Structures are given as C-alpha cells and as structure tokens.
Amino acid sequence: MGLPAQLTLLRPLLLLSYSASYIPITIFRLLISSPSKLLSWSSFQHAWFGNFWSWFGGVSRQNANATVAPLVRSNVSGVVLDIGPGSGEWVNLYAATANKVTKVYGVEPNPEHHAALRRRVEAAGLKGIYEILPVGAQDLGSVGLEFESVDTIVTLQTLCSCPGPQDIIKSLYPYLKKGGTWLVYEHVKTKYHNDFVGYWQPFVNLIWPTFFGGCDIARPTDEWLREAGDWEEVSLRAGEGEGPYDTIPHSLGTLVKRK
C-alpha cells in the first residue's frame, strides 16, 4: 500500500533541510579560505548555494532528465538561445541534436559559471557550436543579436530565479523567428488556488528563495509566456504526475510564434 498523496506536501521541507545541511560546511570552508565573506550575507549565501548545488544540481537534473531530454531533443533546431545555462547541467542534450542545431548561444551573465560551462561544452563535443554570451537576456542587442534571428529559445528552470522575469520574457520574444519555438520547463504557481496547497505554496515560498539561490516557486511564468506575444500554438502541460498536493509544480512544453 502506497503512502498517502498528501505527504507530497512535506517534500519542500525535506528539500529545505538538504540545503540547510550545507550551512556548516560552508562556514568551515569560508573560515579557511575567505573569512571576510562570513561578514557579508550575500557572499555567504552565494557560497552556501554553490556548495549545495554542486551536489543537488546533479540530483535535480537526474530527476528531471526523463522529462526534459525528450522535450529538448524533439523541439530544438537551427539557432538556439539557451537562457541561463549556469554551469551547463543540460548542455549534453544539444550534442544529441547536432544534426538539427547550427548554433547555440548560452546566455549566462554570471562569470563564475563560465569555466564549468566551457568544460561541459567541450566534453559534449560542442566547441564551435555552443558560444557563451556573457550578458543578461535583456542585453542581447549589445552583442549583435538581431530580432527574429533565433529558431528556438530554451528556458529550463531559469525564469524562477532571475530578477524581472516578466520583462525578460517580453524582451526575448522579438528575437524568435516567426514559426520559431520557445521550449519551457519551469517552476510555476499552483493551479489549485482554493485547495490547501494554494496557501501552503506561498508560505513555503517565504523562505524557499533564501535556501535555493533566489528561486521563486510561485511565479505564474506559464501565464507570462502566454501573454508575451502572438502564438500560433501553445502546448504547455503540468509535470508528470503532478497534482493538488505538489508545492513545487512545473509547466513544460512549447509555444510556437505565429508566422
């Protein structure tokens, strides 16, 4: 007999405890290497999340791979904008689509991720195809990218943690060619507003960003994407098996720009 579905509501507490468990080792490492960072909350938080994500990033990717891998492999083509690739957890997926992809621009403004991202690009055999753009999504014009020059935009658990996500979505839409595809796998606000989770999610979200590098699990990102422009086809769905007891639900699928 399986566990009650309601226990899924407790999953965020388990994940928060995983993150919290990295606080002691972060303090210890900073005492040895950079004690001054202990005096800055932002510096400490950055180091803390970095230590935690060095483990949990791989776990998160493994858990989502069965969903994300076929989504990417089936829908990317031509010139791709990979928004917020971080240290490159998903870069290897583009290697499997090398026959369809001509260029991938990894839009990653955080220089601390670039070394790891380059290593993963080279390991995936994508050197010369995957190019890092060290700017924010709203500054793509500064590196020469033109409107309607991109065939595919990819956002994989990125819009939950970036500042000004609604503005970023609106600024990216013009770069997509007519008939181009926006591929999505993002945390979103629960649709079960009147159930317990509708109150539980915003409560958890009071502390979630602190423990998860600024990630906001209650953004209506799917709604913002729908409103970003004129779409010919919108095929977004909930994560596999997600329902009224999931505090960290997802929206995944594609949006095709009207021709």
Where in this protein do the model-derived segments appear?
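A short acidic, Gly/Pro-enriched loop at the edge of an enzyme's catalytic core
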Residues: 138-153
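A short glycine-rich, Lys/Arg-flanked "PGG" loop and its adjoining helix->strand segment in the class I
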Residues: 166-178
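Conserved alpha-helix/loop element of class I SAM-dependent methyltransferases that forms part
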Residues: 55-79, 89-97
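A short SAM/SAH-binding and catalytic strip from SAM-dependent methyltransferases
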Residues: 151-165
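Conserved SAM-binding loop and adjacent beta-strand
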Residues: 36-44, 51-68, 85, 217
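Class I SAM-dependent methyltransferase SAM/SAH-binding core
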Residues: 79-141
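C-terminal alpha-helical "lid/dimerization" subdomain adjacent to the S-adenosyl-L-methionine
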Residues: 49-60, 185-249
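N-terminal auxiliary segments of SAM/dcSAM-dependent transferases
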Residues: 2-39
